[in-house]
Design a protein with these regions (language model features):
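Active-site segment of SDR-like NAD(P)-dependent oxidoreductases
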Residues: 9, 76-77, 117-120
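N-terminal Rossmann NAD(P)H-binding glycine-rich loop of SDR-like oxidoreductase domains
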Residues: 3-23
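Short, conserved active-site loop motifs that form the nucleotide-linked donor/cofactor pocket
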Residues: 46-48
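NAD(P)H-binding glycine-rich loop region in Rossmannoid oxidoreductase-like domains
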Residues: 51-91
């Protein structure tokens, strides 16, 4: 099984990666190039850290090639100034749509978008 996860350095994403690795899956985590939280990711030969932000998700498709499931947990701009910014949120929506397109290009049978971002 091949799994793609955005937001993998967050609480939910990192635990989801660990769960799938325990089940023997090959896990591709798409991580912002400027992320300072890579230490939360497990060390595992089946874990592939792909430097990729929401603005260039489609660039990762050629590296991953194919996947069974795509879990989209990333969202930028969760601080007070950015959460109220239409420009930042428009980028998030565009990135989410690109995640759906990437999942389709990777022939994923399942796509899940989840997170706590709407609670803020």
């Amino acid at each position: 099984m091949r799994i793609v996860i955005t937001g993998a350095t967050g609480f939910i994403g990192s635990n989801l990666a660990k769960l799938f690795l325990k089940k023997g899956a090959e896990v591709f985590v798409l991580v912002r190039p400027e992320s300072t939280h890579l230490d939360v990711l497990p060390k595992d030969e089946k874990l592939h850290v792909v430097s990729c932000g929401l603005s260039n998700v489609m660039d990762c498709v050629s590296y991953i090639k194919e996947a069974d499931a795509f879990f989209h947990l990333a969202w930028g701009g969760v601080n007070r100034q950015e959460i109220d910014s239409p420009e930042v949120q428009a980028k998030n929506v565009a990135g989410s749509l690109d995640c759906i397109r990437a999942a389709k290009a990777l022939n994923c049978r399942m796509f899940m978008d989840a997170g706590s971002r709407v609670e803020y």
